[in-house]
Amino acid sequence: MANYFNTLNLRQQLAQLGKCRFMGRDEFADGASYLQGKKVVIVGCGAQGLNQGLNMRDSGLDISYALRKEAIAEKRASWRKATENGFKVGTYEELIPQADLVVNLTPDKQHSDVVRSVQPLMKDGAALGYSHGFNIVEVGEQIRKDITVVMVAPKCPGTEVREEYKRGFGVPTLIAVHPENDPKGEGMAIAKAWAAATGGHRAGVLESSFVAEVKSDLMGEQTILCGMLQAGSLLCFDKLVAEGTDPAYAEKLIQFGWETITEALKQGGITLMMDRLSNPAKLRAYALSEQLKEIMAPLFQKHMDDIISGEFSSGMMADWANDDKKLLTWREETGKTAFETAPQYEGKIGEQEYFDKGVLMIAMVKAGVELAFETMVDSGIIEESAYYESLHELPLIANTIARKRLYEMNVVISDTAEYGNYLFSYACVPLLKEFMTTLQTGDLGKAIAEGAVDNAQLRDVNEAIRSHAIEQVGKKLRGYMTDMKRIAVAG
């Protein structure tokens, strides 16, 4: 199989990379009705599989789970989760032939085996669904021409998909139809009904493409969402300890600092995050972020280039074939780092203290978010997609670090994201070593002293922060989500 994206000509590549349309609420007036009365079979019962299934069932759809024979016989976690939640469970052979929509929610590395197993069992004219397009775009999986291929990709972990639905809302979602597999022209109707059944239409849906979703998703998770947080955690911890900070305090400042900082990001973008700082600290964070962007830009561009060309995917798939040797080695090495093994701090750190003593961390967040966004947009990805794959998801990933440090982040994210995270962080840490030696008192671990501020400089910095393209599109999208939530709750 050949990488699908690389089989397209340049015009087709640009068209698919740039496909992104914010869909109106009125386009979902029929809700999930297109799939009602039809049989939906989900393959896989992990976080996305279970929680999407729960939402879809609560939306009135007929949901069952197809699992491998051995998973059922051995009563593995997937079988237990499905049965304990009252779902019908059966083998591929028992359930797939009757399915109108088969939703493949297994890990990326299992997709080819799963598709090879289920495709011969699928009835003529059925539909195959994904929540990530890696198998179609990067692996180049060939699907029977009578099968409709669609994607519904919630921009949150599975647990969040469920919790937001229970609140009467949903999570922002990308939907797409594979242009090579829409024989009856019903792909968009299926995708819209599926998205509505998960609650995504209440938070905002982008009509995208398999290509745009995959390329932007890989870029976001490798750089700002995971790679930058891992590299920043290791660098900041080592710097604090080297400067004489208690390792336990240093660990807590970083572990919970990312979550506290990005909560402001979630509520009001980079503007609000920077506004949490004193004026002298804001000016310093801005200056540091500009330095970081200059240093890291080539690394971000290399990751984007390798994602676009398929170099990243081919390297990762080679590691799959080698029993994940690189992935498992990097995972083990991360677990042995000083940050991961540091003692816990029992004292309290106030919310504002995380901002006041984390100026460098704020600069890293700002630089990483803007670089990821800019690099994606420069590569042909539309701003809305770039926003969701950079700034929007960052607080969710930061929350995993707050739970159990980097270990938890790497457990929760996909193996694909974890592999890309290590590639980035292993390159970023040495890249920033010299920069870390130039830090001043007040950049990390201590608050910046109050001092005189040049009004013109502060005015210009505030304007530069607020006028960045990600702040403009972010304000629009966050406003839309707020309005949608208000309507949903009122309803």
UniProtKB/Swiss-Prot annotation:
Binding site for Mg(2+) 1: 217, 221
List of residues binding Mg(2+) 2: 217, 389, 393
Binding positions for substrate per the UniProt entry: 414
GO biological process: isoleucine biosynthetic process; L-valine biosynthetic process
Any single GO CC term annotated in Swiss-Prot or TrEMBL for this entry: cytosol
Pathway: Amino-acid biosynthesis; L-isoleucine biosynthesis; L-isoleucine from 2-oxobutanoate: step 2/4; Amino-acid biosynthesis; L-valine biosynthesis; L-valine from pyruvate: step 2/4
Binding site for NADP(+): 45-48, 68, 76, 78, 108-110, 158
GO molecular function: ketol-acid reductoisomerase activity; magnesium ion binding
Cofactor note as given: Binds 2 magnesium ions per subunit.
Reaction(s) catalysed by this chain's protein: (2R)-2,3-dihydroxy-3-methylbutanoate + NADP(+) = (2S)-2-acetolactate + NADPH + H(+); (2R,3R)-2,3-dihydroxy-3-methylpentanoate + NADP(+) = (S)-2-ethyl-2-hydroxy-3-oxobutanoate + NADPH + H(+)
Record's protein name: Ketol-acid reductoisomerase (NADP(+))
Lineage of source species: Bacteria, Pseudomonadati, Pseudomonadota, Gammaproteobacteria, Enterobacterales
Gene: ilvC
